[in-house]
């Protein structure tokens, strides 16, 4: 065997070894289905795959702020330079759209179901006016936008909902907005993250904490990440907690576009067992608005 062939076979052996190591690592990663946004486009990807699939609705671009419910999809999207709120029934292959109001400036930070309706955290301004923040719920049956004014206590950062109640912060304390619109301070904290199964996840002193809404007690999540390592550009959502897992994007300062950055990567934490994993298919992408659809 010539020296050149030896080099070639050595390189092939190294490549195969690296591939085997990567495959073994990805098999060890918890099997999650993750939805996330990059530059106002939404993708669906398995935590054990390097391949992503863009979520699309025929006739619309920049599908974002996605919520998936069985075979139905709620989202915002662009068409002809205008924003629309969408309800897409995949089984029936039908789409209902509600046009957004045209403002000089508008932005949507988050989406969730509230009182049975697709609802977004909405910021806008017209002309020289100061920006205003509120919730906008969409009545797809009557094709209407319903604006919901919120108290100042919950408007300083991210807003989350369990479908009936609203949770937010004033950067010092966490507040609950009840169904009767009464406001209650529940604990110290700078940012809410998510709420499920009567547990509210939030940030306090850079730590991931949880508040039991039934017992009205709080505690630090022992196996959680140091959230100071994850930039949270108010009130964008670069991480979430769902199904006992944390998924978050660690941003790097070496950005070369609005959606890509050297040394940026996404991590997965198993909060029950204290294990950390790398989301292999998302290296270099600035991702936000994560959803964990299921954990097998």
Regions found by a protein language model. Give the residues of each.
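Membrane-interface motif at the C-terminal end of an N-terminal transmembrane signal
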Residues: 19-35
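Generic signature of mature, soluble extracytoplasmic domains
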Residues: 68-69, 79, 83, 89-100, ...
């Amino acid at each position: 065997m010539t020296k050149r062939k030896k080099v070639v076979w050595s390189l092939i052996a190294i490549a195969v070894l690296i591939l085997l190591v990567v495959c073994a690592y990805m098999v060890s990663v918890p099997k999650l289905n993750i939805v996330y946004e990059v530059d106002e486009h939404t993708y669906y990807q398995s935590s054990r795959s390097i391949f992503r699939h863009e979520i699309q609705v025929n006739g619309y671009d920049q599908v974002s702020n996605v919520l998936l419910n069985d075979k139905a999809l709620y989202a915002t999207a662009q068409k002809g330079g205008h924003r629309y709120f969408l309800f897409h029934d995949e089984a029936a292959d039908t789409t209902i759209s509600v046009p957004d109001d045209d403002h000089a400036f508008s932005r949507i930070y988050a989406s969730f179901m509230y009182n049975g309706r697709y609802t977004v955290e909405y910021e806008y301004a017209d002309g020289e006016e100061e920006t205003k923040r509120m919730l906008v719920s969409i009545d797809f049956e009557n094709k209407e936008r319903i604006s919901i004014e919120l108290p100042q206590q919950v408007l300083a950062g991210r807003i989350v909902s369990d479908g009936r109640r609203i949770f937010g912060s004033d950067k010092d304390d966490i507040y609950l907005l009840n169904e009767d619109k009464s406001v209650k301070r529940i604990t110290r904290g700078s940012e809410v993250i998510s709420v499920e199964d009567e547990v509210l996840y939030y940030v306090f002193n850079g730590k991931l904490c949880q508040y039991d809404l039934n017992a009205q007690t709080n505690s630090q999540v022992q196996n959680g990440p140091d959230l100071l390592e994850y930039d949270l550009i108010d009130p964008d959502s670069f991480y979430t907690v769902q199904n006992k897992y944390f998924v978050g994007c660690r941003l790097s300062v070496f950005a070369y576009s609005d959606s890509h950055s050297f040394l940026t990567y996404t991590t997965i934490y198993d909060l029950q067992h204290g294990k950390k994993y790398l989301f292999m298919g998302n290296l270099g992408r600035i991702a936000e608005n994560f959803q964990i659809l299921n954990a097998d």
